[in-house]
Amino acid sequence: MAVLREVELASQVSVRGEPQPGFPVESNTATGDVLWLGPDEWLVLGGREEDYPDAAAAVDVSANRVCFELAGEDVEDVLAQGCSLDLHPSVFPPGGCAQTLLARAQVILHRTDPERFRIFVRPSYEPYLRAWLEDALTSPRSSLRRR
């Protein structure tokens, strides 16, 4: 049985510029709590602006996104109902991340484990996406159920 829950994160920092030591530099990857979002853009979970003095820009964006966690053996089936990315583990393994659309809402998907995703969405879309995910969990296409 899977769980859909909102995750409280300590902070989120957007870092722009040259890669910092230990940052991922390949598309669709994450290193720990550092998500690669583009050629010169990362999202650091739990970081602080002052931790990146050599970055072109480091901005606290903690209020910019709400984070959901979706976990369960059929998590890919739930997400496939509203996302066109191939989320099979051979293509999107643990540590993978991507900016995409989920049910027409712009999100960041981060696969943290084989059966667990974090979904980052703008606060204005949070009620819509929460309702969509709850509906998707009860879909006949999924054996997942929310608690």
Regions found by a protein language model. Name each.
Residues 1-147:
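Basic, glycine/lysine-rich polyanion-binding surfaces/domains
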